[in-house]
Regions:
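Long, highly charged, low-complexity intrinsically disordered interaction regions
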Residues: 2, 11-65
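Conserved hydrophobic positions within beta-strands
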Residues: 7-9
Length: 65
């Protein structure tokens, strides 16, 4: 279980961001509003997470603190 992810914001798309933590890029799905309020590329960000595991999918959903 992941409680949160803190790292360097590498990419912003319409429905997800990529956060680099120690050289590993986490794809975190977020709302458009959450992405807009997250920060700028290159900044350190912290996102609370929900880690969803299904038979055919593993996803991370992020929420602003």
């Amino acid at each position: 279980m992941l409680a949160y992810i803190k790292g360097n914001l590498e990419m912003k798309m319409t429905d997800y961001v990529v956060i680099d933590v120690g050289g590993l890029g986490y794809k975190v799905f977020m709302s458009e509003n959450g992405i807009e309020n997250l920060g700028n590329i290159g900044e350190t960000v912290k996102v609370h997470t929900h880690y969803r595991v299904r038979e055919d999918d593993i996803s991370i959903f992020g929420f602003n603190t």
